A protein has these predicted regions:
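Short, solvent-exposed turn/loop segments enriched in Gly/Ser/Thr/Pro and often Arg
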Residues: 4, 62-72, 113-122, 171-180, ...
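Long, internal low-complexity/basic segments
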Residues: 114-120, 124-136, 273, 318, ...
């Protein structure tokens, strides 16, 4: 394995201005240049790799794993200023605007994707004592997304300049719904440094008394904004309701995809990406490596969907489990529980995309059947016994 073309960090949390675990190739980076911003570095490295790889005729694969917009909320001030007043309207009004935008763009339909009530009915923006802080937090979050978008634009421009764009497949997606996490609950430890590399203290503001955006402040957007970002769904990252597991997925392949600019609602799973790449390369998944047997991939190719040849999902059954939160989807039926000891709920996603009408009580046989399938798959995917 060639490790020279790698720029990465270790751990899930990054100081965007000076990552302490930054590795370039096989060497730790101990000093970053003035003005360093990690999102830019990822994008610039990707552009450099394309310049390098495009010089020969061999196919190339590039995995561009942006950290943004994962907390901590870090962004250059000039980027934050673009969104300085955007979120002063508050959670509820921003939700309403986003929901209407999704309808106007044809991404959702009102007949099967009604907007649930705000999950925090006791909270009112007008009486929010932290409105200035909360508005600033979302402005930083938006700035992080904006900067990532700029870096992806540079990557696309480089593909076009090298003549590679038309025959390059680009997958763009997020690993989960927006996160409700508040880093102030954690404090320093593990991948969360208590100080910058040059010795300045990093604060985790419990009382929201340090404004987000700067290198020395580690903060997140919290559950109210996570719920808003995940419009029209409920819940957020780490939960198996749609707000936690449903992610935008954009595919760009100019020379082959004829259905341009349309929205498809075929379900697929992240495990299907490897199978799709194998299909694109016209090869087969390996059975062994260095004398070790490799488990067969459970993914299925998305090519039939992308080429307009299938109206179905990639899998017969989709399975999720994360710290006890769990779900199973079979066609349009979805069985889901909020936490390990929580009750199973049942939703008909064809008519209730936003999981507002729990029909478990009126469909006990379907619940039992899907629950049995979930338990069987939990054994296969090694949910049991719980890993150390």
């Amino acid at each position: 394995v060639d490790l020279t073309n790698i720029l990465e960090i270790y751990g899930g949390v990054v100081d965007y201005f000076d990552p302490f675990s930054l590795v370039n190739g096989i060497k730790q980076v101990e000093h970053v240049p003035t003005g360093y911003y990690h999102t830019d570095a990822i994008g610039d490295s990707a552009v450099a790799y394309i310049e390098q790889f495009s010089k020969n005729k061999s196919p190339f694969f590039l995995y561009v794993a942006h950290c943004a917009p994962h907390w901590p909320l870090h962004a250059p001030e000039e980027e934050i200023e673009k969104y300085e007043n955007t979120y002063n309207l508050g959670w509820r009004e921003i939700r309403r605007i986003r929901y209407q935008g999704l309808i106007d763009k044809g991404i959702i339909r009102t007949e099967n994707a009604k907007m649930p009530d705000f999950m925090f009915p006791e909270l009112d923006w007008e009486s929010n004592p932290n409105a200035k802080w909360d508005s600033r937090a979302m402005a930083v979050h938006a700035a992080m997304v904006d900067r990532m978008d700029q870096s992806i634009g540079k990557l696309v421009d480089k593909l076009e300049a090298t003549g590679e764009l038309a025959n390059t497949v680009i997958f763009f997606f997020s690993d989960n719904g927006a996160s409700s996490e508040r880093p102030s609950k954690y404090g320093p430890g593990f991948d969360r440094a208590g100080s910058t590399r040059d010795g300045r203290e990093v604060v985790f503001p419990v009382q929201k008394d340090s404004m987000p955006g700067a290198q020395t402040v580690h903060s997140g957007i919290g559950p109210e904004w996570a719920h808003t970002i995940n419009t029209p769904f409920r819940f957020w990252k780490a939960k198996s309701f749609e707000g936690g597991i449903n992610s935008p997925f954009i595919v760009h392949w100019p020379s082959k995809i004829t259905d341009k600019g349309i929205v498809k609602d075929n379900p697929a799973h992240v495990v299907d990406i490897m199978a799709t790449c194998i299909d694109l390369a016209n090869t087969t998944y390996p059975e062994n490596y260095n004398g070790h047997v490799i488990k067969p991939t459970v993914g299925k190719s998305m090519l039939p969907i992308l080429m307009g040849k299938s109206t179905e999902g990639t899998q017969e059954v989709y399975f999720w489990e994360h710290f006890g939160a769990a779900a199973l989807r079979k066609k349009d039926w979805k069985l889901v529980r909020l936490e390990k000891d929580g009750p199973w709920e049942l939703y008909d996603l064809a008519n209730d995309r936003t999981e507002m009408n729990n029909v478990a009580e009126s469909n006990p046989k379907i619940v039992q059947k899907l629950k049995k399938e979930w338990e069987d798959l939990a054994q296969i995917y090694e949910v049991y016994p719980a890993p150390n």
